[in-house]
Amino acid sequence: MNLAAYFPVLLFLIVGTGLGVALVSIGKILGPNKPDTEKNAPYECGFEAFEDARMKFDVRYYLVAILFIIFDLETAFLFPWGVALRDIGWPGFMAMMIFLLEFLLGFAYIWKKGGLDWE
């Protein structure tokens, strides 16, 4: 395998990273640093802060976010499978049906355990 063909990519990564680090460093060194309480306060659309900026979220929001990511990944696997269905034949079809069955069983388990209830 000829690794010389990948040299431009490596050079691009090195130059890009170096330029980014250099610009951030120059800004940090040359920029004024005069913090005060007003600058350090959290910004809420021009209004005074209503509550503490570090308020706690209910765990159910995180559960819904994780479930969304899981089922979003399922959709990401479904699209290329649908495009290549004629090329992969019955073995690919059966593999995806097993994959979908696992997700449906997981969804049924979450539903039965009350993971989707908000009360």
Curated annotation (Swiss-Prot):
Chain segments annotated as transmembrane: 7-27, 63-83, 88-108
A GO cellular component entry from the record: plasma membrane
Keyword annotations: Cell inner membrane, Cell membrane, Membrane, NAD, Quinone, Translocase, Transmembrane, Transmembrane helix, Transport, Ubiquinone
InterPro entries referenced in this protein's UniProt entry, alphabetically: NAD(P)H_OxRDtase_bac/plastid (IPR023043), NADH_UbQ/plastoQ_OxRdtase_su3 (IPR000440), NDAH_ubi_oxred_su3_sf (IPR038430)
Catalytic reaction(s) noted: a quinone + NADH + 5 H(+)(in) = a quinol + NAD(+) + 4 H(+)(out)
Secretion signal, residue range per the UniProt entry: none
Major location (coarse): membrane
EC number(s) given by UniProt: 7.1.1.-
Molecular function via GO: NADH dehydrogenase (ubiquinone) activity; NADH:ubiquinone reductase (non-electrogenic) activity; quinone binding
Family: Belongs to the complex I subunit 3 family.
Function noted in UniProt: NDH-1 shuttles electrons from NADH, via FMN and iron-sulfur (Fe-S) centers, to quinones in the respiratory chain. The immediate electron acceptor for the enzyme in this species is believed to be ubiquinone. Couples the redox reaction to proton translocation (for every two electrons transferred, four hydrogen ions are translocated across the cytoplasmic membrane), and thus conserves the redox energy in a proton gradient.
UniProt protein name: NADH-quinone oxidoreductase subunit A
Organism: Paraburkholderia xenovorans (strain LB400)
